[in-house]
């Protein structure tokens, strides 16, 4: 029997994958929107098992996310390698001090990466780079069509890139508007040169249920490009909203050192109805060439949960510990902040063995950088626990755990202050779902539970069984008291809340608009994915 692996290869909020190979090594990056550090970079030798090396943008000087709206920030990176240098090109959307397309470089994919080279006169999003075998470099991206006739009418355009000056030169040219008649949101372009032909692969249909991957080719890089008559080469939009994988699109291709071709792409796994709290995830699917065109998932034409393993030597990496005891000098790479941190609101040194969060006026509901350290929800069923030492000094002070889709759709599970500490479970959402991905609809707070609690050391537990989230508190290890069970988690999904991100779970502290000198100390945090089979 052939070996198989289980999709997705990166579960949880890891959208817009881009991949490149250097020798026997594979590198992959993803979008991160309003989260900091930006653009995780992963390394693999077998395309199935991945380890995170770090982030492309891990310094505030590289990534000004201040004031970025929910699901603004970093869109759709591309990673490429050329003559000893790695390049990542990306778009910052909605920046209050800087926005647009930029390039960063490194000679080691683990970093450090350069400061951004911002590109002038480069409109649109989803930029990609192509290095031709004659030494020339090219920028390819999408933008609103110059003769836009309908909402979502975009075009793919090309211009030469001067690598020495890091600027666009020559005249831009339009390559394609997509395969479908009146195609919407032609985006995510990548160029490849295979057997002397230039192939332009894009996504179209929008990054939700109607997502698709299409392709065209030309003998000249500037075109004209002829569409594959068998487009789209992959989509699941015809399979219905109750199919186990939906929204397939935004793909990139890689050829192994042994001549196999594979595609990485995003998709979603709905559960509890058409809701996908895990966001858009990274999947892997085989590809072969027939009559000069790619055939994706030969024999089925579908992205599968169980797929044959690439013909590569297996390379597993040490497992990431389920429990973080905060005993290192730096945060593990799976931890993120909301927007760019501009002060030292967190510390692993102030109290060794603890993550200390300083209470600040910023709230989770603000488009700000609150005292929040979180990680992705990566399983439909999971258990997360944490130990917190905290003495609230005023009614406005709180600390605990939060589940976050965005600033208007989240759940706060916190200890609040005053003479008698109280456990508060608060849901922020709207009464009805958001029918559009953007903009985010303002939400309101609803208290689901509150109860007084004694002590200064608290144990939190959140368990999810599909869309049912349950919350427990304790003052002694494993002596759990239910706060609320079976809370509806659908507000944590994009089809309800809008936007483009997946759910985060993490640690949070705030003085809710008031000054404070207090802090919250988290002794440990554990996240355990439970069997979904």
What would you call each of these model-derived segments?
Residues 1-533:
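Carbohydrate-active catalytic/glycan-binding domains of CAZyme proteins
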């Amino acid at each position: 029997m052939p070996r198989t692996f289980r999709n997705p290869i990166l579960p949880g909020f890891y959208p817009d994958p881009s991949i490149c190979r250097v020798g026997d090594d594979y590198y992959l990056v993803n979008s991160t929107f309003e989260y900091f550090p930006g653009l995780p970079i992963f390394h693999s030798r077998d395309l199935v098992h991945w380890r995170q090396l770090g982030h492309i943008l891990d310094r505030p000087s590289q990534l000004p996310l201040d004031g970025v709206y929910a699901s603004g920030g970093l869109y759709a990176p591309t990673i490429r390698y050329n003559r000893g240098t790695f390049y990542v090109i990306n778009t910052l959307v909605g920046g209050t001090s800087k926005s647009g397309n930029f390039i960063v470089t490194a000679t080691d994919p683990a970093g450090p990466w350069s400061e951004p080279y911002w590109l002038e006169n480069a409109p649109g999003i989803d930029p990609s780079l192509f290095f031709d075998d004659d030494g020339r470099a090219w920028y390819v991206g999408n933008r609103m069509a110059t003769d836009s006739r309908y909402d979502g009418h975009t075009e793919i355009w090309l211009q030469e890139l001067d690598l020495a000056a890091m600027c666009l030169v020559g005249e831009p040219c339009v390559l394609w508007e997509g395969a479908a008649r009146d195609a919407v949101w032609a985006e995510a372009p990548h160029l490849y040169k295979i057997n002397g032909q230039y192939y332009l692969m894009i996504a179209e249909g929008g990054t939700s249920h109607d997502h698709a991957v299409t392709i065209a080719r030309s003998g000249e890089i500037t075109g004209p490009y002829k569409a594959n008559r068998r487009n789209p080469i992959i989509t699941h939009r015809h399979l219905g909203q109750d199919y186990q994988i939906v929204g397939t699109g935004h793909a990139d291709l890689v050829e192994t050192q042994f001549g196999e071709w594979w595609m990485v792409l995003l998709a979603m796994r709905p559960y509890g109805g058409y809701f996908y709290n895990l966001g858009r995830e990274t999947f892997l699917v085989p590809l072969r060439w027939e009559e000069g065109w790619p055939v994706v998932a030969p024999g089925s034409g579908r992205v599968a949960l169980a797929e044959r393993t690439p013909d590569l030597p297996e390379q597993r990496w040490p497992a990431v510990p389920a429990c973080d005891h905060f005993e290192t000098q730096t945060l593990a790479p799976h931890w993120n902040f909301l927007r760019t941190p501009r002060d030292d609101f967190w510390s692993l040194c102030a109290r060794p063995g603890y993550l200390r969060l300083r209470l600040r006026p910023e709230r989770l509901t603000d488009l700000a950088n609150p005292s929040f350290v979180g990680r992705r929800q990566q399983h439909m069923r999971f258990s997360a626990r944490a130990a917190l030492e905290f003495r609230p000094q005023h009614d406005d002070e709180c600390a605990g755990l939060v589940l976050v889709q965005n600033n208007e759709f989240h759940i706060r599970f916190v200890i609040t202050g005053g003479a008698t500490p109280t456990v508060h479970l608060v849901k922020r959402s709207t009464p009805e779902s958001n029918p559009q991905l953007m903009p985010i609809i303002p939400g309101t707070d609803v208290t689901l539970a509150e109860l007084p609690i004694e002590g200064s050391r608290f144990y939190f537990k959140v368990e999810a069984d599909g869309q049912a989230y349950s919350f427990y508190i304790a003052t002694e290890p494993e002596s759990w008291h239910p706060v609320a069970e079976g809370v509806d988690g659908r507000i944590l999904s994009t089809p309800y809340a809008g936007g483009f991100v997946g759910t985060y779970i993490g640690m949070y502290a705030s003085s809710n608009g008031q000054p404070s000198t207090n802090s919250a100390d988290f002794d440990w945090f554990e996240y355990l994915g439970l069997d979904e089979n």
